[in-house]
Amino acid sequence: LKALLLTQGMHGMISQVEGLAKALNLNYKHQEIKLKKFWKFIPPFLTPPSMSVLETQFIFDSKIVISCGRKSVIPSLALKKKYKDKIFTIHIQDPKVSVDKFDLIICPEHDNLVGQNVIKTIGAIHYLSEKEISKEKNYLQVDRETKKVITLVLGGPNKYYDFSDKEMDFLFNKIKTIFTRDKYKLVVIPSYRTPP
């Protein structure tokens, strides 16, 4: 079964749509969504469900659409409007439109969405499987007998936040001040966006 994955191209969104597609054992292709300038600033509930608001068009040949993020709502709705019951639409996160516009919505509990087609999660879904985690279980093997473990999951710069050397120094000095070296072990887990 083929699926089209729609996101804005951010890793956090890609990991969610790919995770669901892999869990459902779907063949999938990813389409990054870019709205035309004017429509970037308009909320989904005010944007017409039309492919004409997209910067680039794409070929659609799937039975399932999995979307994530605000900008992917519109092309998903446009495809549903065109193909009706011939396709099944799934949106991950709060779409900021009526839940009835999708066949299924998967969102974190804290989004407080309610509906017969809403599945609530604790945290975000992702593409790591139990098999992959089990295979890498020794990757972060830590001697817990002697020290308490502090784990820092470190992201990276985005359009709202820049990881400067000054900010990194501040962060690590703060950690060093709070957690003395002799009692704690720091485990830093970088993301693909973490600067070198």
Report residues per predicted region.
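Structural motif
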Residues: 2, 63-64, 88, 104, ...
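Short N-terminal targeting/anchoring amphipathic segment
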Residues: 58-69
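Short beta-strand elements of ligand-binding domains
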Residues: 68, 88-94, 108
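Glycosyltransferases and closely related glycan-assembly transferases
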Residues: 17, 74-88
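N-terminal pre-catalytic "stem/leader" segment of glycosyltransferase-like enzymes
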Residues: 1-53, 60
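A nucleotide-sugar donor-handling region in carbohydrate enzymes
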Residues: 100-164
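Catalytic donor nucleotide-activated moiety binding site of glycosyltransferases and closely related
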Residues: 181-196
